[in-house]
Amino acid sequence: MRWRTIQARYCFLLVPCVLTALEAVPIDVDKTKVHNVEPVESARIEPPDTGLYYDEYLKQVIEVLETDPHFREKLQKADIEEIRSGRLSQELDLVSHKVRTRLDELKRQEVGRLRMLIKAKLDALQDTGMNHHLLLKQFEHLNHQNPDTFESKDLDMLIKAATADLEQYDRTRHEEFKKYEMMKEHERREYLKTLSEEKRKEEEAKFAEMKRKHEDHPKVNHPGSKDQLKEVWEETDGLDPNDFDPKTFFKLHDVNNDGFLDEQELEALFTKELDKVYNPQNAEDDMIEMEEERLRMREHVMNEIDNNKDRLVTLEEFLRATEKKEFLEPDSWETLDQQQLFTEEELKEYESIIAIQESELKKKADELQKQKEELQRQHDHLEAQKQEYQQAVQQLEQKKFQQGIAPSGPAGELKFEPHT
C-alpha cells in the first residue's frame, strides 16, 4: 500500500496544515480522453508535516504499521468512526513480531527524546527537584506508564491526541489571523498619532486608496460551484469548457490517484480565484490574508461536500454535490475585504492586552537596565580599587628605591639589579 492510501484512512491524523500557497499540478490534456482512469502506482510521495511536535514519531508509526499485511487489510476496511473509537487499535495485538519489535524501538526512542526535552527544560529553569515521571504526563500521545513497549493503548492515544490537536489547528489559525489584523490596525493608528495633521490626512488618503485598489478585482466565483470548477478546467487544465465533466474533473485533480480529494488537493483548486484578489507584487495585497481566504474556501467546500466529516472528499460525495441547486446557482462569495473582521470593542480589548504586555516588558526592561547600571557601578568600583592598588605598589617601590632597598617581585621576592 502506498503512503497516500494510508493517509486517506488516517486523514484526521495526517491532514496537512498548509500555510503556503499550493499551486495546482499541471495536467496532461490527453488524460481527459480516458474517463475510466485507473489508479496507477506513482513515485513515493513524502507525507506532509502535520505541524505536531510529535510529527516524526507519528509518521514512523504509520510507516511501520503499513508493512503488516493484516493491519493494512483491517485499515482499508475500517471506517473513520472505527478508527476514532479505538476499536482498530485492538488489531495491534495481531501484527507480526517484527512489526511489534520495531514499534517498541520507536516508542523507546520517543520516550528518550521527550526525556531529553524535559531535562533541557529543567536545566534552563535550574530546577532539579521536579519529578520526570510527572512531567511525562503532559505528553498525551503515548502511554508513559510503560516506556518500553508499544501496546494497543499507545496507538489509541496517538490517534486521539493527533485528532484533537489537528481539529484545533484551523481554529487556532483563524484566531491568530484575527490578532494579526487587529495588530495591523493598532500599529496604523499609533503611527497616525505621531504625525502632524497634514501628514495624517495624507496617510489616511493613501490608506483609503490602497484599500480601494485591493477591493477592485474581478468577481470571485463561489468555491466549489460549477462556475468555479469550470474556470479551473478551462484556465488551469487547458480544456474546452463545453466538455466539462465532474467525474473527469475529480480524477484529474485526484493528483495521487488515491480516490479522494484531500485538503491539499482542494486548496489547489482555489489558486485561480485567489489570484484574482491577491498579487504578491502589489503593496495593497497581503499574502497572509490570501492564506486565510484559502483556508475559508477549503472549510466551506468541506462543510458542503464532506458528508461523513472525515476531511476527505470521495468521488461519490463530489458527484452528489454537483447535483445540488447550489452547484449551479450559488450565493455570491464574500471575500475578506467585504467582511468586518473585528469590532471596535474587540480592538479595544486587544489593545488593552497589548498595553498590559508592553507595561510588563517595560518593567522587565527597567529592571534589566538597573541591573546593568549596578553591574557597571561594581565594575567601575573594582577598576578604581585596582588603580589605587597599582598606584600604592608603585609608590611603595619608589620609596624602597629611594631608601636603597632592593625592589620586590610580584610574590614579595627580592629583585637584584645585575652589576655591570
Curated annotation (Swiss-Prot):
<dbReference type="GO" id="GO:1901142">
    <property type="term" value="P:insulin metabolic process"/>
</dbReference>
<dbReference type="GO" id="GO:1990680">
    <property type="term" value="P:response to melanocyte-stimulating hormone"/>
</dbReference>
<dbReference type="GO" id="GO:0009749">
    <property type="term" value="P:response to glucose"/>
</dbReference>
<dbReference type="GO" id="GO:0046321">
    <property type="term" value="P:positive regulation of fatty acid oxidation"/>
</dbReference>
<dbReference type="GO" id="GO:0005509">
    <property type="term" value="F:calcium ion binding"/>
</dbReference>
<dbReference type="InterPro" id="IPR011992">
    <property type="entry name" value="EF-hand-dom_pair"/>
</dbReference>
<feature type="modified residue" description="Phosphoserine">
    <location>
        <position position="332"/>
    </location>
</feature>
<protein>
    <recommendedName>
        <fullName>Nucleobindin-2</fullName>
    </recommendedName>
</protein>
<dbReference type="GO" id="GO:0005797">
    <property type="term" value="C:Golgi medial cisterna"/>
</dbReference>
<keyword id="KW-0732">Signal</keyword>
<dbReference type="GO" id="GO:0005615">
    <property type="term" value="C:extracellular space"/>
</dbReference>
<dbReference type="GO" id="GO:0005640">
    <property type="term" value="C:nuclear outer membrane"/>
</dbReference>
<keyword id="KW-0106">Calcium</keyword>
<feature type="binding site">
    <location>
        <position position="258"/>
    </location>
    <ligand>
        <name>Ca(2+) 1</name>
    </ligand>
</feature>
<comment type="similarity">
    <text>Belongs to the nucleobindin family.</text>
</comment>
<dbReference type="GO" id="GO:0005164">
    <property type="term" value="F:tumor necrosis factor receptor binding"/>
</dbReference>
<keyword id="KW-0963">Cytoplasm</keyword>
<feature type="binding site">
    <location>
        <position position="254"/>
    </location>
    <ligand>
        <name>Ca(2+) 1</name>
    </ligand>
</feature>
<dbReference type="GO" id="GO:0005085">
    <property type="term" value="F:guanyl-nucleotide exchange factor activity"/>
</dbReference>
<dbReference type="InterPro" id="IPR018247">
    <property type="entry name" value="EF_Hand_1_Ca_BS"/>
</dbReference>
<feature type="domain" description="EF-hand 2">
    <location>
        <begin position="293"/>
        <end position="328"/>
    </location>
</feature>
<feature type="region of interest" description="Disordered">
    <location>
        <begin position="194"/>
        <end position="225"/>
    </location>
</feature>
<keyword id="KW-0238">DNA-binding</keyword>
<keyword id="KW-0597">Phosphoprotein</keyword>
<dbReference type="GO" id="GO:0042594">
    <property type="term" value="P:response to starvation"/>
</dbReference>
<feature type="signal peptide">
    <location>
        <begin position="1"/>
        <end position="24"/>
    </location>
</feature>
<feature type="binding site">
    <location>
        <position position="317"/>
    </location>
    <ligand>
        <name>Ca(2+) 2</name>
    </ligand>
</feature>
<dbReference type="InterPro" id="IPR040250">
    <property type="entry name" value="Nucleobindin"/>
</dbReference>
<dbReference type="GO" id="GO:0046627">
    <property type="term" value="P:negative regulation of insulin receptor signaling pathway"/>
</dbReference>
<comment type="function">
    <text>Calcium-binding protein which may have a role in calcium homeostasis. Acts as a non-receptor guanine nucleotide exchange factor which binds to and activates guanine nucleotide-binding protein (G-protein) alpha subunit GNAI3.</text>
</comment>
<dbReference type="GO" id="GO:0007264">
    <property type="term" value="P:small GTPase-mediated signal transduction"/>
</dbReference>
<feature type="domain" description="EF-hand 1">
    <location>
        <begin position="241"/>
        <end position="276"/>
    </location>
</feature>
<dbReference type="GO" id="GO:0005783">
    <property type="term" value="C:endoplasmic reticulum"/>
</dbReference>
<feature type="short sequence motif" description="GBA">
    <location>
        <begin position="304"/>
        <end position="334"/>
    </location>
</feature>
<keyword id="KW-0256">Endoplasmic reticulum</keyword>
<feature type="binding site">
    <location>
        <position position="306"/>
    </location>
    <ligand>
        <name>Ca(2+) 2</name>
    </ligand>
</feature>
<dbReference type="GO" id="GO:0045599">
    <property type="term" value="P:negative regulation of fat cell differentiation"/>
</dbReference>
<dbReference type="GO" id="GO:0005737">
    <property type="term" value="C:cytoplasm"/>
</dbReference>
<dbReference type="InterPro" id="IPR002048">
    <property type="entry name" value="EF_hand_dom"/>
</dbReference>
<dbReference type="GO" id="GO:0001965">
    <property type="term" value="F:G-protein alpha-subunit binding"/>
</dbReference>
<feature type="binding site">
    <location>
        <position position="256"/>
    </location>
    <ligand>
        <name>Ca(2+) 1</name>
    </ligand>
</feature>
<dbReference type="GO" id="GO:0070093">
    <property type="term" value="P:negative regulation of glucagon secretion"/>
</dbReference>
